[in-house]
């Protein structure tokens, strides 16, 4: 599984470019709907770029963990908002299957909005739903590690890596090399040390002579 680390500067630039496309289309949303969890930060940035103060959140459950999905996307918590006649803009970080956008648009249409459009930072042609606006088309399937989920994603792929040789003691360098070989991603040593410390505190790994050993952890393989 190919992974790519996305910096906050890259996120900022993608949302800024996305906002320019929306303005150029003359669509003027009154309310932005950020899809939780991945769409929260892009939605807030979009509010800033478009000068919109009305922001609501919609929790859509689709991804279980890094690279693993449910069969269908579902709305976790119902909205208690009056959206009748409003121009809505749904914002998410990426669409690769399209299930989150399909579920959210179908749900929000029940609120009788005046209009409803969708925007994502990134769009993969594998998606069953093409958003109205996107900043970047991703032609090769990639798992993007955004600033808001780098701990969640990186701990998951480290556990998967260490589970391939669960009895071994892994050094920090061996983990870095393994991540690069299996997932095409590499953290610098400072960030790797920080990540391993977090995993040790959470009880996912144990520090031992020569490095770290994986503890009993549920591992989902792709």
Please annotate each region the language model reported:
Residues 1-222:
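PRPP-associated nucleotide enzymes
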């Amino acid at each position: 599984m190919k992974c790519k680390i996305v910096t906050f500067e890259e996120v900022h630039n993608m949302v800024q470019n996305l906002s320019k496309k929306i303005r150029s289309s003359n669509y003027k949303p009154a309310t932005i709907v950020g899809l939780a969890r991945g769409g929260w930060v892009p939605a807030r940035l979009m509010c800033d770029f478009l000068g919109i103060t009305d922001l609501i959140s919609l929790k859509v459950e689709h991804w279980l963990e890094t690279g693993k999905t449910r069969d269908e996307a579902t709305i976790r918590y119902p909205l208690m908002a009056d959206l009748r006649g409003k121009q809505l803009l749904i914002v998410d970080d990426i669409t690769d299957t399209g299930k989150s956008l399909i579920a959210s648009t179908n749900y929000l249409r029940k609120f009788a909005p005046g209009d409803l459009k969708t925007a994502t930072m990134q769009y993969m042609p594998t998606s069953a739903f093409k958003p109205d606006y996107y900043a970047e088309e991703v032609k090769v399937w990639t798992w993007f590690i955004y600033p808001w989920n780098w701990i969640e994603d990186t701990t998951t792929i480290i556990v998967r890596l260490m589970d391939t040789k669960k009895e071994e003691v892994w050094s920090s360098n061996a983990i870095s090399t393994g991540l690069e070989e299996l997932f095409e991603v590499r953290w610098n040593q400072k960030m790797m040390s920080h990540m391993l410390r977090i995993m040790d505190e959470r009880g996912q790994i144990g520090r031992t002579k020569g490095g770290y050993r994986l503890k009993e952890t549920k591992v989902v393989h792709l």
